[in-house]
């Protein structure tokens, strides 16, 4: 798996970096969010506690997936802005009992 950064936008108003990337994974299935997040955090020297993978999109018959991630300046801002289901999906918060 190889990740290529296509664009990084600095959103100072919200306090985050917006990262657009492509994943090359010939002969392999679409990589998991956990694997992609780990590689992005290592590549860009980000904090794993404030980095969220918004989506990874794969296309039929292609070994290229496109993704979008957000890296926040603070955990408080991330918890305020991001929808709960995204935070649960990325493993940043626990799912509430009974849901």
Swiss-Prot record:
Q: Give this protein's Gene Ontology molecular function annotations.
A: rRNA binding; structural constituent of ribosome
The molecule here is called Small ribosomal subunit protein eS24
PANTHER family this protein is in? 40S RIBOSOMAL PROTEIN S24
Name the PROSITE patterns on file: RIBOSOMAL_S24E
**Does this entry carry the keyword tRNA processing?**
no
Its quaternary organisation is: May be present in 2 copies per 70S ribosome. Part of the 30S ribosomal subunit, where it binds 16S rRNA at its canonical site at the bse of the body, as well as a possible second 50S binding site near 23S rRNA helix 45.
The answer, when asked if Ribonucleoprotein is one of the entry's keywords, is yes
List, alphabetically, the InterPro entries matched. Nucleotide-bd_a/b_plait_sf, Ribosomal_eS24, Ribosomal_eS24_CS, Ribosomal_uL23/eL15/eS24_sf
Q: Which residues form the signal peptide?
A: none
Question: Which family is this sequence assigned to?
Answer: Belongs to the eukaryotic ribosomal protein eS24 family.
Offer one Pfam family short name for this entry.
Ribosomal_S24e
One cellular component term (GO) for this entry is: ribonucleoprotein complex
Question: Gene encoding this polypeptide?
Answer: rps24e
- Example GO biological process term? translation
């Amino acid at each position: 798996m190889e990740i290529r950064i296509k664009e990084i936008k600095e959103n100072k108003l919200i306090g985050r970096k917006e990262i657009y990337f492509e994943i090359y994974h010939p002969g392999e299935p679409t990589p998991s969010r956990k694997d992609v997040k780990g590689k992005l955090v290592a590549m860009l020297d980000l904090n794993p506690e404030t980095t969220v993978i918004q989506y990874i999109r794969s296309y039929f018959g292609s070994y290229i997936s496109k993704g979008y991630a957000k890296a926040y300046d603070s955990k408080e801002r991330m918890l305020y802005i991001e929808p709960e289901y995204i935070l649960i999906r990325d493993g940043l918060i626990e799912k509430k009992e009974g849901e």
